[in-house]
């Protein structure tokens, strides 16, 4: 959950309003958010997922233009690799179970029947199927998640921001499991005139650096 805005400053304003403790969710903390619109971007340590950019032939033109723009700002991103030896698909049951728990009332009340998309992998059926996830497999997935969090930290600890294509890799599911923030920015249109984007991954509680870039 996060802001959808037209400018970085708008994002900072909205994020600063919705972040932190609300007295209801005990998992939320009041972490610092020291956003400075005039910060020197050259002070940031920036990496990029070179292998994903090299393999993203669909959006290559727009990706290259985005990286060129970033370099014009005086930033020279360094190649980075994320963990790739863990079964992320197996850990997906964690996200499925958490999503189903969040929408438990919707499922129990049968109001999910009112949702239009009722295909096999649509959310209503995903939430229903989540009730059949074995507890043992869920616990084993949590153990793998701990390993993923440690490995992700070791791979990315030296960087304030990591640039990545929005699609084509496991970074979305990975950061969903580790809790690292992600900022998505439109960067043009493809041959079918569909909008394209590029993504920026940050450190835990590193939203200020993400928005500043």
Put a short name on every predicted segment:
Residues 3, 9, 16-24, 51-54, ...:
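Generic secondary-structure signature for well-ordered alpha-helical cores
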Residues 82-95:
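Acidic helix-start/capping segments at beta-turn-to-alpha-helix junctions
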Residues 9-16, 64, 100, 104, ...:
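Predominant activation on well-ordered alpha-helical scaffold segments within soluble catalytic domains
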Residues 55-83, 103-116, 138-159:
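Acyltransferase
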Residues 40-49, 94-149, 186, 190-197:
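Short helix-loop capping/hinge segments that flank enzyme active sites or metal/cofactor-binding pockets
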Residues 1-18, 165, 176-199:
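Short glycine/serine-rich loop segments
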Residues 1-61:
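A short helix-breaking turn/cap at a secondary-structure junction
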Residues 150, 156-180:
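An extended, acidic, His-containing surface patch that forms the Zn2+-binding/catalytic region
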